[in-house]
């Protein structure tokens, strides 16, 4: 793996508050670490494949799940449901270490693992947010909740509707809006230029016709 990529990923792992949600469970981190040690580099002959596989696994060990929970959802999840996702991760890592796949087929399995973990994680995030954002259901919540930002177990509370199921990435949204307006402005400019050229050509034709008629009259006199 390139040194720069390794340092970048390790800095994400070592930074305070770099872990969250799934990474709050030390057994999940241990399972992912063991999987990485077992597969890389022994099961990848090409350095490029080693780097890609390492990036997938170390990304899962880093702050990705915390950022996903905070930027897309409210960043909290019921601990009993999160435990199920953690067990899923540990079982899947054991399965991958036990098979004989190598190189590209193994890399594809790692990418599939990440996608499946995200899918399961998303389910529990949505499940809690649906209940916590419901004014009637939220008061009935009793199960302990994990704060993904601080890795702290907290008491469930009702969440104001303005914080429910919203995209908390204004910079990305702003950039998207600017990019989406640019093609429309370009199209409008193109239309204006086309209309202006059409009017100009029409005026030239009219002037030419009038000049021709005047010259013809002079010739006939």
Swiss-Prot record:
Endpoints of the signal sequence: 1-20
Transmembrane segments: 187-207
InterPro entries assigned to the protein according to its UniProt record, in alphabetical order: IZUMO (IPR029389), IZUMO2 (IPR042920)
Main location: membrane
Coiled coil ranges: none
Cytoplasmic topological intervals: 208-221
Family that this chain belongs to: Belongs to the Izumo family.
Protein name: Izumo sperm-egg fusion protein 2
Organism: Homo sapiens
Taxonomy of the source species: Eukaryota, Metazoa, Chordata, Craniata, Vertebrata
């Amino acid at each position: 793996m390139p040194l720069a990529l390794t340092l970048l990923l390790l800095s994400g792992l070592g930074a305070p508050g770099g872990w969250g949600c799934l990474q709050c469970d030390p057994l999940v981190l241990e399972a992912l670490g063991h999987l990485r040690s077992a597969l890389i580099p022994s099961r990848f002959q090409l350095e490029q494949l080693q780097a890609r596989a390492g990036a997938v696994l170390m990304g899962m060990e880093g702050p990705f799940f915390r950022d996903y929970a905070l930027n897309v959802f409210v960043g909290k999840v019921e601990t009993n449901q999160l435990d199920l996702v953690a067990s899923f991760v540990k079982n899947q890592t054991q399965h991958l270490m036990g098979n004989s796949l190598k190189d590209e087929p193994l890399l594809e399995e790692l990418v599939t693992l990440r996608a499946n973990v995200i899918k399961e994680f998303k389910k529990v995030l949505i499940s809690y947010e649906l209940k916590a954002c419901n004014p009637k259901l939220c008061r009935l919540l009793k199960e302990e909740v994990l704060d993904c930002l601080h890795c702290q177990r907290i008491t469930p509370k009702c969440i104001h509707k303005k914080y429910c199921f919203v995209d908390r990435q204004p910079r990305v949204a702003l950039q998207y809006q600017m990019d989406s307006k640019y093609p429309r402005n370009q199209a409008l400019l193109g239309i204006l230029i086309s209309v202006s050229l059409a009017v100009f050509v029409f005026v030239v034709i009219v002037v030419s016709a009038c000049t021709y008629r005047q010259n013809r009259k002079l010739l006939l006199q």
